[in-house]
Amino acid sequence: MAVFRSGLLVLTTPLATLAARLPPILTSASRLVNHTLYVHLQPGMNLGGPAQPQASPVQATFEVLDFITHLYTGADLHRHLDVRILLTNIQTKSTFLPVLSSVQNLAHPPEVVLTDFQTLDGSQYNPVKQQLERYATSCYSCSPQLASVLLYPDYGTGELPLEPPNALLPSTIRPASPVARSPRQPVRGYHRGAVGGTFDRLHNAHKVLLSVACVLAQEQLVVGVADKDLLKSKLLPELLQPYAERVEHLTEFLVDIKPSLTFELVPLLDPYGPAGSDPTLEFLVVSEETYRGGMAVNRFRLENGKEELALYQIQLLKDQSHNENEEDKVSSSSFRQRILGNLLQPPNERPELPSGLYVLGLTGISGSGKSSVAQRLKNLGAYIIDSDHLGHRAYAPGGPAYQPVVEAFGTDILHKDGTINRKVLGSRVFGNKKQMKILTDIVWPVIAKLAREEMDVAVAKGKTLCVIDAAMLLEAGWQSMVHEVWTVVIPETEAVRRIVERDGLSEAAAQSRLQSQMSGQQLVEQSNVVLSTLWESHVTQSQVEKAWNLLQKRLPKAYQTRN
């Protein structure tokens, strides 16, 4: 059967039974849709009757909110799908507006409409499919060539799961009030509320948080998006999507799921954000991790003469397929870890480089573990050009940079044997931009020339892939000599610790060295592949092997034969 880029799944089974049926339904849908899957909840709708069914309100209860959580949890097993539960017809007890009084536009118009509704004979019965298509197009903007499919998932026994009438989903949404509530208790609606987060690489746990907030809000939802100082403590912050990109993805998702709301997306620059200062807000949705932060917001509000917000706590979604060193919850940190070793942007064509030689530039801040990665690549078959080694050749007496450097910085930078004391020279230039530029204007062109000569040596030895290991690769402009830039990143605090331990410098001297270099963020912005040595050695090895294997797949055969 054809695979569609976008689809609409209309769920008609009563909630009490639907929860147990979700896994096979999602599996069936994932075989037909390969990108965006919208979900419309209409329990009890009959597509087999004489009358054309119409959209009707679904009472927002805690059971419905729990179901939303369970659906997104199940969707996490199908990572190729961008699942979006549509909320226009899910309404709180305080507001019953006309449901879908006009056709709702969707960012990705469905090409196919699917349903769990089944005919008695298990066929693709045309009148039912026609009713389904009419229902879908009366509610949402769909593709003109809309197809329809009645799903018949394998439920094991072939029968609906039998559950006692009081069998309810476990609670995943908790109001801050200690008062016990029934899962079928209606949810209160509020005029304005707030939710906050980093929202990097929007995932299903984010979608639960945002969806609950959208159900509770009747007029406006304020969304705080973490930026600047609040990002510094994040794992692999260099791989965070830019603020504008995160806001763009958030906006599309929010407008898709509940266009009747007004959304205000603002930078979150401190732990309180708008929730701490806006007197018109009534509720705040938090996760288990941020619940204490929500309590702190309420204390801050009380201290400043504002009413407390109603807090709604969402349980964390368990990541059922997390890897080693990843969190056991669905998180953006794990998504960023999975990017390590992947190609982030296309390689560069370098026709001026030696024919038949593919060149990687390996860089990273001091202490990043770049040289250990170079050794791992060497073990896999790469020819390594060590820029530090070339620098030693350039600085050596009689070397191409020796005399110009001595003339520029004086003979007091020399050892008694006439060799350049690089520690003394380094103390002159680190932290002094003018002196550093004088040195680099001399040395960088010399090392670049030596590197090109080494490329010719690699070709003569029959090598087809070489790596230029250079901390200053991008500062020196040597990216023009490579097809791909690979960057090794670690937190600056870890880099300082390693430099102090390795080189015997003070923390201040180590920080000064790092400040004279491009930041990890600046390096990543110009990189094709990113790696990290933050974890155990075997984790680094797995990353490097992953990156190497992906490289082999995208290399032309001419570059693969002699390594």
UniProtKB/Swiss-Prot annotation:
SUPFAM superfamilies: Nucleotidylyl transferase (SSF52374), P-loop containing nucleoside triphosphate hydrolases (SSF52540). Keywords: ATP-binding, Coenzyme A biosynthesis, Cytoplasm, Kinase, Mitochondrion, Multifunctional enzyme, Nucleotide-binding, Nucleotidyltransferase, Phosphoprotein, Transferase. GO terms for cellular component: mitochondrial matrix; mitochondrial outer membrane. Widely expressed with highest levels in kidney and lowest levels in colon, lung, intestine, and spleen. One of its GO terms (biological process) is coenzyme A biosynthetic process. It catalyses: (R)-4'-phosphopantetheine + ATP + H(+) = 3'-dephospho-CoA + diphosphate; 3'-dephospho-CoA + ATP = ADP + CoA + H(+). The modification N6-succinyllysine is found at K461. Residues 359-562 form the DPCK domain. It is found in: Cytoplasm; Mitochondrion matrix. InterPro entries: Cyt_trans-like, Depp_CoAkinase, P-loop_NTPase, Rossmann-like_a/b/a_fold. Residues 179-357 are annotated as: Phosphopantetheine adenylyltransferase. ATP binds at G364, I365, S366, G367, S368, G369, K370, S371. The modification Phosphoserine is found at S177, S182. Its main location: cytoplasm. It holds the Pfam family CoaE. Its EC number is 2.7.7.3, 2.7.1.24. One of its GO terms (molecular function) is ATP binding. Pathway: Cofactor biosynthesis; coenzyme A biosynthesis; CoA from (R)-pantothenate: step 4/5; Cofactor biosynthesis; coenzyme A biosynthesis; CoA from (R)-pantothenate: step 5/5. Monomer. Bifunctional enzyme that catalyzes the fourth and fifth sequential steps of CoA biosynthetic pathway. The fourth reaction is catalyzed by the phosphopantetheine adenylyltransferase, coded by the coaD domain; the fifth reaction is catalyzed by the dephospho-CoA kinase, coded by the coaE domain. May act as a point of CoA biosynthesis regulation. HAMAP family: Dephospho_CoA_kinase. In the central section; belongs to the eukaryotic CoaD family. This is Bifunctional coenzyme A synthase. It comes from Mus musculus (Mouse). The lineage of its organism: Eukaryota, Metazoa, Chordata, Craniata, Vertebrata.
